[in-house]
Amino acid sequence: MPPVAFIDNKRAVAALFQEALLSAYPVLHKDDAPFVIEVDKPKNPDHGHFAVNSALQLAKKLGARPRDIAEAIVGALPKSDLLAGKPEIAGPGFINIRLAPAAETRVVESVFAAGDEFGLGTEGAGRKVMVEFVSANPTGPLHVG
């Protein structure tokens, strides 16, 4: 595997929020199927780089208001140079996240550092794959499923 120090900000944000969620709600440690934080890109760029709606998804399970859950998650976030300030809680419990400028530039720096090896990996090596071409709707997002 090439020495690529590619920093995936989306995964890093997910890990940060997963840690905060489990810190705020230790009861989730006991679940057979642990809850996994999903980080999405908001449709409106004014809402930040990423958004998390886990508070809405967990409200019924935790028996709490989504906004209270969101506040607990944000309050439990560990210090990180990944985020630009405190994430914003919007609406009923959405958490909007802005990345620090340094976090964005680290991705570009890792691409240049990898040089010609950027994008190479060993996942799936030696196996055949089938690639299908789609007729995508240019006005909507592309998805699988």
What residue spans do the PLM features occupy?
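Short, small/acidic-rich helices and loops at N termini and domain boundaries
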Residues: 46, 50-68
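N-terminal catalytic cores of NTP/NDP-binding nucleotidyl/phosphoryl-transfer enzymes
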Residues: 57, 61-62, 106-145
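Short, well-structured alpha-helical segments that form the helix of a local strand-helix-strand
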Residues: 70-78
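Short, flexible active-site-proximal loops enriched in glycine and acidic residues
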Residues: 68, 80-90, 118-124
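Short, charge-patterned binding micro-sites
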Residues: 35-53, 90-95
